Amino acid sequence: MGSRLHVQEIKKGPPLPFKDDIRAFTREYAESLDAQDPLRHFRDEFIIPSKKDLKRKTLNANENIEDSSDPRSIYLCGNSLGLQPRNTRKYLEHYLRTWAIKGVTGHFTPHDDQLLPPFVDVDDAGAKLMAPIVGALESEVAVMGTLTANLHFLMASFYQPTKEKYKIILEGKAFPSDHYAVESQIQHHNLDPKDAMVLIELENLDRPILDTEKILRVIDEHASSTALILLSGIQFYTGQYFDIEKITAYAHSKGIIIGWDCAHAAGNVELKLHDWNVDFAAWCNYKYLNSGPGGMAGLFVHENHGRVDMTKVGSKDEPFRPRLSGWWGDDKKTRFRMENRFVPQPGAAGFQLSNPSVLDMNAVAASLEIFNRTSMAEIRKKSLDLTGYLEHLLLKYPLDAAPEDKPFSIITPSNPAERGAQLSLRLGPGLLDNVLEVLEENGVVIDERKPDVIRVAPAPLYNTYADVWQFCQIFFDACQKAVRARK
């Protein structure tokens, strides 16, 4: 009788943590979490595609795309492409207006109602907005280029192979573009990737996780011949969040430079690139940072590597780190003198080449401005709860099934500290296509990695607990239908 009364009291009271509340599997519980969410107002800052939008065959540019009677989609794909902030249009219109009424003088003419400074200084504004998101000094960040191009620029500076130290260590299952970039850098130095490219391979394909100790063992094995390590902050396929601080410190203890591809980490987890003494990093801004498809990327160069010794300029001693140079990295005070004597700006700005696309910078800034209204600590706190709730619902389905009988398994680490927003679900053989069909029919947007994985990533700025709950109901139904179809 006592336990029954206890259950009744729980049902009447405020929501408890989802692991302790029997109501966690109800829509009402999810909505109660949304009502208590201190970041809930940020959802209104983004345009959520409707279910009708996803099925439309024409753009109909003059049509209202935000009909309140048209249900919104369940968009859990911020790990692939973030949604459009509402203020992106305003930022772009300000840019177009400036270009229209000022032409080339827009490079230097400030306006009382400007959202960004004149064209010549927009890169500084981008760095200021980006720095707190990746835990960097403003001088250590540049918003520029694209991810793989930036990795090439950085490796051109940081990969300086010698006869003794010439190897690059990276994941065996790194994102293909990273693999290609490393391979081509090695070939560019007339080295053989078969000898100079060290891949950290998985020990168990059924558990596609790279333990930190495994990574450290590989570093130990090749320390005397390794010139550079390049790893992902968060692994794109599994969603595993690597221990950046520990691995970086270990690499440095062996005298090895280490860089990080933070494409799936920037805007997702709380990075501290400066405090962790990361040598360099690069990332794209179109995933969790919502800058639009192929939007301008970012890079980080620790202040230890960005110094310019003005007392040595013009001497035989190298006053700054070697790099591929361009005029936009030149000292601002002398840039427009066209003297053909390169002296870089200190910090990451000195790694810039061409002047940035002001159009793209406005799209990046529109989203970063929203991030700067809160903090990555607060965003990460909600993300842990949101993805934890998703995991809780997934693990309880179906309640009466043994693990080997479930239609899916979660291949992302179960420790919340070892993952970001994303959970990667591996479906049973032959289920993927049918599951995707049901999800699409019901306005659910996720992405897949064939032959059997879907990636689900609730973005804390615009996704809700109700989104997560509703996704799970549709996903469970999709699994049931796919299992029946397979039989």
UniProtKB/Swiss-Prot annotation:
SUPFAM superfamilies: PLP-dependent transferases (SSF53383). Pathway: Amino-acid degradation; L-kynurenine degradation; L-alanine and anthranilate from L-kynurenine: step 1/1; Cofactor biosynthesis; NAD(+) biosynthesis; quinolinate from L-kynurenine: step 2/3. It comes from the Eukaryota. Its EC number is 3.7.1.3. This is Kynureninase 1. GO terms for cellular component: cytoplasm. It comes from Aspergillus oryzae (strain ATCC 42149 / RIB 40) (Yellow koji mold). Keywords: Cytoplasm, Hydrolase, Pyridine nucleotide biosynthesis, Pyridoxal phosphate. GO terms for molecular function: kynureninase activity; pyridoxal phosphate binding. InterPro entries: Kynureninase (IPR010111), PyrdxlP-dep_Trfase (IPR015424), PyrdxlP-dep_Trfase_major (IPR015421), PyrdxlP-dep_Trfase_small (IPR015422). Pyridoxal 5'-phosphate binds at L147, T148, F175, P176, S177, D178, S232, D261, H264, Y286, W327, N355. Homodimer. Its cofactor is pyridoxal 5'-phosphate. Its main location: cytoplasm. The modification N6-(pyridoxal phosphate)lysine is found at K287. One of its GO terms (biological process) is L-kynurenine catabolic process. It is found in: Cytoplasm. It catalyses: L-kynurenine + H2O = anthranilate + L-alanine + H(+); 3-hydroxy-L-kynurenine + H2O = 3-hydroxyanthranilate + L-alanine + H(+). Catalyzes the cleavage of L-kynurenine (L-Kyn) and L-3-hydroxykynurenine (L-3OHKyn) into anthranilic acid (AA) and 3-hydroxyanthranilic acid (3-OHAA), respectively. Belongs to the kynureninase family.
